[in-house]
Amino acid sequence: TIINVKCTSPKQCLKPCKDLYGPHAGEKCMNGKCKCYKI
């Protein structure tokens, strides 16, 4: 899921992704936005 959070590194996506999917969330930074996925 791509969320509307700007990023330059995946670390910036860690908290919003965990808020979305809980502790087992994965995160990437793609094209300046966070992408979250369930592991």
Curated annotation (Swiss-Prot):
Physiological role: Blocks human voltage-gated potassium channels Kv1.2/KCNA2 (IC(50)=0.7 nM), Kv1.3/KCNA3 (IC(50)=26.2 nM) and blocks intermediate conductance calcium-activated potassium channel KCa3.1/KCNN4 (IC(50)=56 nM).
Further information: Negative results: does not block voltage-gated potassium channel Kv1.1/KCNA1 or the Shaker IR (with inactivation domain removed).
Family: Belongs to the short scorpion toxin superfamily. Potassium channel inhibitor family. Alpha-KTx 02 subfamily.
GO CC terms in record: extracellular region
Protein name: Potassium channel toxin alpha-KTx 2.16
Residues the UniProt record annotates as site (Aromatic residue of the functional dyad): 37
Localization terms from the record: Secreted
GO MF, any single term: toxin activity
